[in-house]
Amino acid sequence: MEFYYPNYINDMWRIMGYIFHGDRNWFVDERAKCFKKEMIVEFLLDKGIALYDTASAIRRLQDNASDKFLEVVTPTDLPRLLGQIPRCTAIVTTGQKATDTLCDTFHISQPAIGSFSPFVTEGRELRLYRMPSSSRAYPMKLEKKAVFYRKMLEEIGLL
């Protein structure tokens, strides 16, 4: 995969456009039916948002992207990764498999959707936020999902 949340049907970049610019199509190239990757990268760099996978190797048990049918073969070395980004204060997950992987790695309880679980690793205090999935398969309107994301972004100081 070339980039995170590249599927035109996924609403991650629409949620971010809606929150930061008041326009769900801010990062959308409607003609080409794709996202404006360069604008997204610039936005992420400007805001100090990093994206990464919780697994470096997975096995798809069925021919779809559902978390239910993904097996984590090799989890990402998250403590090592966090050591490379010392200013990171929060981790955000949008899927159950990522949440499970993080909770298992750091031995923390799962936060409810829209909230966080505090945890300490290597002497650092962090928060694990659990957001609603940006997939349209998750039964919630984009504007309602944006309420959860906005609250989290305000709490971590990005809004």
Q: In which residue ranges do the predicted regions lie?
A:
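Short, surface-exposed acidic-centric catalytic microdomains
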Residues: 2-70
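Generic structural signal for beta-strand residues in well-ordered domains
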Residues: 42-44, 84, 121
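Short, mixed-charge, low-aromatic patches
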Residues: 33-38, 103-109
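C-terminal capping/extension of enzyme domains
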Residues: 6-8, 15, 62-79, 104-159
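Internal catalytic-core helix/loop-beta-alpha segment
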Residues: 46-105
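Secondary-structure boundary/capping signal
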Residues: 24-25, 89-90, 110
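Extended aliphatic helical segments
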Residues: 28, 39-41, 72-73, 92, ...
